[in-house]
Structure formats: structure tokens, C-alpha cells
Amino acid sequence: MEKLFGTFGIRRVVNEILTPDFALKLAYSFGTYINQETVTVGRDARKHSEMIYDAVISGLLACGCQVIELGLTATPTLQWACRQWNTWGAMITASHNPPQWNGIKFMEKTGKGLDHENDVEVEKIFYSEKYDFVSWK
């Protein structure tokens, strides 16, 4: 089982490993883990960030999360919003990595990245594929 998370989120080459499907499944995992809570989501200006952003939002909504969309924003702004609004966070950014890379930084309600224990729990859900989808009945 490959470790997904690094120091702060995941970073991968877009459309090699970090595909819309990968982002969707990772968002299912995070959405399942936080049990339908609210998530504030933002992205950076990379061309492919919008694709990953849309996949993450879709995955969170499928698991019953409420989503606040910030769109194009800076990571510190999203961190502030998480603290201010008491929400979880997801930032689509590769920070300083080369242009072909992108990443997803999940945040706690404090605006800080997930701690190791939370990373491990999200990874377990990701690899087990035991997602909690909301019923639309």
C-alpha cells in the first residue's frame, strides 16, 4: 500500500497519477472520513487545477458534504476561511513544484494540514474503497 500523503497533502504528475478519477476517489475518502461536514475548497492558477478542483467537489458532494467554493485563491486565504468558518478545507495546488505537477491539500478546521493519524485514516478508506455515499432518495 503506497503512502499517499506527504508533509502537507499529496502531489503527483497530472494525468499520470493525479487524474480526475484519482482526485474523485481521494475526495470520496476524505468526505467519508469527515462524515458529511462542510468543506471549503480553493484552487491555484495552474491550467489543470480547475479539472482537479471540479473532481474534488464532485467527490465531496457525492458523500453528502456541504461545499463552499472559493475558486481561485491563495492557500493562506483558504486556511483563514477554514478557521473563520469552522470548516474542513481542500486546496488544489502544487505550490513550488514544476508545471506538470499538482496536488491536493486537505485541511483541518484549524486551517492546518491533516495530522498523520487523519492522513492514515483517509488512506485506509481510499485503499478499501469503502465510501459512504449519500442517498438521493
Language-model-detected regions and their locations in the chain:
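Residue-level signal for pocket-adjacent positions within structured domains
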Residues: F5, G9, P99-N102, K109, ...
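Generic alpha-helical secondary structure signal
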Residues: D21, P76, H116-V120
